């Protein structure tokens, strides 16, 4: 794997490009809508105080320029851009190029399986490999935190090739890699698509045009029992789906297990007291007379159409009853159209 093309110029794209290039693990190219803002040299500042300097071989808005001849593609994009990017790169993909994503739970595999050749190698991280932040666009970024290891999935190649590719990812990203059973285990999660959407419905389902709130809500600090009850119901429906899918039993913990809780009351206490969540605010915007929900925020534009929707579609396909998820999804999609 000598040539990797990073697709997308966000924080993860900056860090992945700089980190891999600086460690000379591959020739790094970048596909971005703003090539004029990028330097051929990008610096990544690590938690250890290091400054890694990576040289990029090519930066372009033309997929033909940077995708042609690439051995690996890594999408660092929000869910709503994945379909468009797949269609953009498709004509220039080598038949043996591994096309992947930095985060699998925003619909990458569901779209790639529809758009790309059924033989095209696909891969993806279950969770993002880095916590990242842009310092100066196209020039520098902060790598704020690493995962201790990565769960990835690889599709449409032999078991031997999967293992070889996992070894390459471990070397390129500097952490051990565990191969998941299939793309479903990377794509289906009860984090953002369940956690966020259940809370948003509880906060805003009664809102209508003309209502003004006096202030912006805390998203987690005021997590209440009603929000926790809805989250538990949606999580139960999600696990009913997993029971009929070809996934490894227990590959994900339930919401109650993950947050070391036993009922809605204890879950509400737990979610409202996690230090890392303290101060995070609900997606709202200031208008004349107060505050209203911001339906253009990522909470809405990502987690409903590019998270919960795929869970619901699989439920329908497999005959799994999902009344709570159906209700929440229908409401959320009505706000994002």
Show which residues each predicted segment covers:
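NAD(P)+-binding Rossmann beta1-loop-alpha1 motif at the extreme N-terminus of oxidoreductases
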Residues: 1-52, 58, 65-67
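Residues at the C-termini of beta-strands that transition into short coil/loop
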Residues: 32-34, 63, 103, 126, ...
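NAD(P)-dependent Rossmann-like dehydrogenase/reductase catalytic/cofactor-binding core
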Residues: 207-215, 221, 225-337
């Amino acid at each position: 794997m000598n040539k990797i093309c990073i697709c997308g110029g966000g924080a993860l794209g900056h860090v992945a490009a700089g980190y891999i290039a600086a460690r000379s693990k591959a020739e790094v190219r970048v596909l971005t809508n703003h090539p004029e803002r990028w330097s051929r040299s990008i610096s990544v500042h690590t938690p250890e105080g290091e400054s890694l300097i990576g040289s990029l071989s090519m930066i372009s808005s033309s997929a033909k320029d940077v995708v042609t001849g690439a051995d690996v593609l890594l999408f660092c994009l929000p869910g709503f851009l994945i379909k468009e990017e797949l269609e953009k790169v498709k004509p220039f993909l080598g038949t043996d190029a591994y096309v992947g994503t930095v985060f699998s739970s925003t619909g990458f595999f569901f779209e790639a399986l529809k758009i790309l050749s059924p033989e095209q190698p696909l891969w993806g991280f279950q969770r993002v490999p880095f916590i990242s932040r842009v310092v100066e666009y196209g020039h520098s970024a902060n790598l704020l935190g690493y995962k201790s290891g990565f769960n990835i999935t690889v599709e449409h190649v032999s078991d031997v090739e999967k293992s070889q590719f996992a070894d390459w990812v471990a070397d390129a990203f500097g952490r051990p890699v565990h191969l998941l059973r299939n793309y479903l285990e990377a794509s289906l999660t009860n984090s953002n698509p369940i956690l966020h959407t259940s809370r948003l419905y509880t906060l805003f389902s009664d809102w209508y045009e003309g209502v003004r709130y006096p202030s912006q809500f805390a998203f987690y600090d005021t997590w209440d029992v009603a929000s926790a009850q809805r989250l538990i119901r949606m999580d139960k429906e999600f696990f009913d789906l997993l029971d009929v899918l070809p996934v490894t039993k227990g590959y994900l913990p339930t919401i109650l297990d993950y947050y070391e809780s036993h009922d809605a009351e204890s879950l509400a206490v737990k979610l409202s007291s996690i230090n890392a969540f303290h101060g995070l605010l609900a997606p709202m915007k200031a208008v004349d007379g107060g505050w209203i929900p911001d339906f253009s925020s990522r909470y809405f534009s990502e987690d409903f159409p590019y998270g919960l929707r795929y869970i619901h579609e699989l439920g329908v396909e497999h005959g799994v009853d999902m009344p709570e998820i159906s209700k929440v999804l229908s409401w959320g999609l009505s706000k994002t159209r």
